Amino acid sequence: MKQVIFVLLDRYADWEFAYLAPALRGEVAQGYQVRFASSDMLAKISIGGLTMRPQLTLDEIPEDAHALVLIGAAGSWREDPPERIAQLAHAFKDSGRVVGAICDAARWAGSVGLLNDVRHTLNDPHEMADFPGYTNAQGYLPEESVRDGNIVTANGNAPVAFAANVLRALEAAPEKAIQEYADFYTI
């Protein structure tokens, strides 16, 4: 089974993975295992009040996982998230594996230099000027979700487009199946 790891922080946005996780668990793709990781094993509570206990700590993420998906959270990506997440995200990117970041997680990815050589999108590109680690304003595209190779970003209003682009990056299913899934939730 190919593992896709979702990183959750406190006050995570429960809707931002609500389309991708089931798509990977058989709605669109076969052969994927979805797992949730965080800095510790304590329960995380979503913006909507959903309580989830991570299955893994960041240090337990398997080296052979196929993708790392960073889910937005109300304020948590702005409150000094663990350095281990940046290490993992760069390692996944450097080894050609898929990295997805949505909403404030995409902003954070830009702040740690993860988006400096790829086209990407964000909630608000203007606030990126505050981050010396971000040097790719010209790579910003005003779109719901952007895929550049194995890096996928999305603004917080685009969980369906984000799911479709992560599925494409993983080559998890034929394009027709991915597009039909996305269309079902957007048309």
Range-by-range predicted roles:
Residues 17-22, 86:
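Short amphipathic alpha-helical segment that frequently serves as the phosphate-/nucleotide-binding helix
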Residues 12-17, 45:
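Short N-terminal binding/cap micro-motifs at the start of the first secondary-structure element
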Residues 47-55:
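Short gly/ser/thr-rich secondary-structure transition/capping motifs
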Residues 2-7, 11-12, 26-40, 55, ...:
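Active-site-adjacent pocket-lining segments in enzyme domains
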